[in-house]
Amino acid sequence: MANEITEQEEVKCSFCGKPQSQVKKIVAGNGVYICNECIDLSKKIIDDELKADSIKETKDLPKPMEIKKQLDEYVIGQDRAKKVLSVAVYNHYKRISQMDIDSSGTELQKSNIALIGPTGSGKTYLAQTLAKILNVPFAIADATTLTEAGYVGEDVENILLKLLQNADYDLERAQRGIIYIDEIDKISKKAENVSITRDVSGEGVQQSLLKILEGTIASVPPQGGRKHPQQQMIKIDTTNILFIVGGAFDGIENIVKNRLGKKTIGFGAENGLNQVDADDWQKNLTTGDLVKFGLIPEFIGRIPIITTLDKLSTKDLIRILTEPKNALVKQYKKLLSLDNVDLEFTEGALKAIADMAISRHMGARGLRSIVENSLMDVMYRTPSEDNIEKVEITKDVITKHAQPKITYKENESQEASEAAK
């Protein structure tokens, strides 16, 4: 262990060569000595290198317009949400990179994000794509599985364990990752009236999430599950973890419309309600509306950025099927091409797939299962039948479960129903 030199003979710093009489302090190590001036200089060199690394990291960070452009390659529509997310994540990681080099004393607070939109509108996919663009660890949690500590269910700390696992247990990377908590609307307070039963999966979970959302040193069990006194914990600092929460918030538009449409008591109070367009409730959504829905003020206070996603139209879903880099149609085309089979979808088929997803209230989330079901027989047959050249999916395949049109390499074209026996 290093100790201050007190011997009578004068020693010299092993780094600069100055004797003890010319410096304030000299510390001895294992056969070497270092003076206070060299310690200060070493610290300055390290700080300068860290500052240079932080500046480089900031320069390498994609700008908001660049982030949105990359989001556009994978996510169709939702321009408002993409702009909000692009600015928010840019500011978040810029804040992190400047923390070590800012000497002004101005502390930049973390800004977590809430995404509000119907099922299948792209909330989870947006968060996933952001993490991919920024090359940071990402984890998804379902709020409905969480309970307050001490009750049956999953502790909120296990969300952090998922992030750590996805970062291959690289603690530094995990502490700069993104966590998406889905179905956040399902942990709203069960009722405004006081109940003798503790709300362990509603308000209790919101209370448990407060600290990790704001920034704390959380103790995480390395193998998951409940905490045990004798179990060694992993300490994770959540200060720089970006939390994105999402939910459908069914009925929130009525809360907004009622607030905007209310008039004071008097003539015309009942019949004079303002008409609120579909877009207006999204533009006028406030934190107060979310509190009215059932989120506690302390929870909302830790999620300052709120944006909404639109319900996807038939046109949007058709574009989702065909346009993004990893569009479903492109994926299945690639899959069948590995068996030397061309796959085509008619315009009628694409529209039928989109209409069916909307009718099932699944949005983009329902597209894959519809396409998968329509191609099941084809994917079963093509690996074994070498003479299949092309498969065409028509509207009837989607709506009436008809067989797709198959073209054979011998130029024999017939309905699959005639060929399959």
UniProtKB/Swiss-Prot annotation:
<feature type="domain" description="ClpX-type ZB">
    <location>
        <begin position="1"/>
        <end position="54"/>
    </location>
</feature>
<dbReference type="InterPro" id="IPR010603">
    <property type="entry name" value="Znf_CppX_C4"/>
</dbReference>
<comment type="similarity">
    <text>Belongs to the ClpX chaperone family.</text>
</comment>
<dbReference type="GO" id="GO:0140662">
    <property type="term" value="F:ATP-dependent protein folding chaperone"/>
</dbReference>
<comment type="subunit">
    <text>Component of the ClpX-ClpP complex. Forms a hexameric ring that, in the presence of ATP, binds to fourteen ClpP subunits assembled into a disk-like structure with a central cavity, resembling the structure of eukaryotic proteasomes.</text>
</comment>
<keyword id="KW-0067">ATP-binding</keyword>
<dbReference type="GO" id="GO:0051082">
    <property type="term" value="F:unfolded protein binding"/>
</dbReference>
<feature type="binding site">
    <location>
        <begin position="118"/>
        <end position="125"/>
    </location>
    <ligand>
        <name>ATP</name>
    </ligand>
</feature>
<dbReference type="InterPro" id="IPR027417">
    <property type="entry name" value="P-loop_NTPase"/>
</dbReference>
<dbReference type="GO" id="GO:0046983">
    <property type="term" value="F:protein dimerization activity"/>
</dbReference>
<keyword id="KW-0862">Zinc</keyword>
<feature type="binding site">
    <location>
        <position position="35"/>
    </location>
    <ligand>
        <name>Zn(2+)</name>
    </ligand>
</feature>
<dbReference type="GO" id="GO:0005524">
    <property type="term" value="F:ATP binding"/>
</dbReference>
<dbReference type="InterPro" id="IPR046425">
    <property type="entry name" value="ClpX_bact"/>
</dbReference>
<comment type="function">
    <text>ATP-dependent specificity component of the Clp protease. It directs the protease to specific substrates. Can perform chaperone functions in the absence of ClpP.</text>
</comment>
<feature type="binding site">
    <location>
        <position position="38"/>
    </location>
    <ligand>
        <name>Zn(2+)</name>
    </ligand>
</feature>
<dbReference type="GO" id="GO:0016887">
    <property type="term" value="F:ATP hydrolysis activity"/>
</dbReference>
<dbReference type="GO" id="GO:0051301">
    <property type="term" value="P:cell division"/>
</dbReference>
<dbReference type="GO" id="GO:0051603">
    <property type="term" value="P:proteolysis involved in protein catabolic process"/>
</dbReference>
<dbReference type="InterPro" id="IPR038366">
    <property type="entry name" value="Znf_CppX_C4_sf"/>
</dbReference>
<dbReference type="Pfam" id="PF10431">
    <property type="entry name" value="ClpB_D2-small"/>
</dbReference>
<keyword id="KW-0479">Metal-binding</keyword>
<feature type="binding site">
    <location>
        <position position="16"/>
    </location>
    <ligand>
        <name>Zn(2+)</name>
    </ligand>
</feature>
<dbReference type="Pfam" id="PF06689">
    <property type="entry name" value="zf-C4_ClpX"/>
</dbReference>
<feature type="binding site">
    <location>
        <position position="13"/>
    </location>
    <ligand>
        <name>Zn(2+)</name>
    </ligand>
</feature>
<protein>
    <recommendedName>
        <fullName>ATP-dependent Clp protease ATP-binding subunit ClpX</fullName>
    </recommendedName>
</protein>
<keyword id="KW-0143">Chaperone</keyword>
<dbReference type="InterPro" id="IPR004487">
    <property type="entry name" value="Clp_protease_ATP-bd_su_ClpX"/>
</dbReference>
<keyword id="KW-0547">Nucleotide-binding</keyword>
<dbReference type="InterPro" id="IPR003593">
    <property type="entry name" value="AAA+_ATPase"/>
</dbReference>
<dbReference type="GO" id="GO:0009376">
    <property type="term" value="C:HslUV protease complex"/>
</dbReference>
<dbReference type="InterPro" id="IPR003959">
    <property type="entry name" value="ATPase_AAA_core"/>
</dbReference>
<dbReference type="InterPro" id="IPR050052">
    <property type="entry name" value="ATP-dep_Clp_protease_ClpX"/>
</dbReference>
<dbReference type="InterPro" id="IPR019489">
    <property type="entry name" value="Clp_ATPase_C"/>
</dbReference>
<dbReference type="GO" id="GO:0008270">
    <property type="term" value="F:zinc ion binding"/>
</dbReference>
<dbReference type="Pfam" id="PF07724">
    <property type="entry name" value="AAA_2"/>
</dbReference>
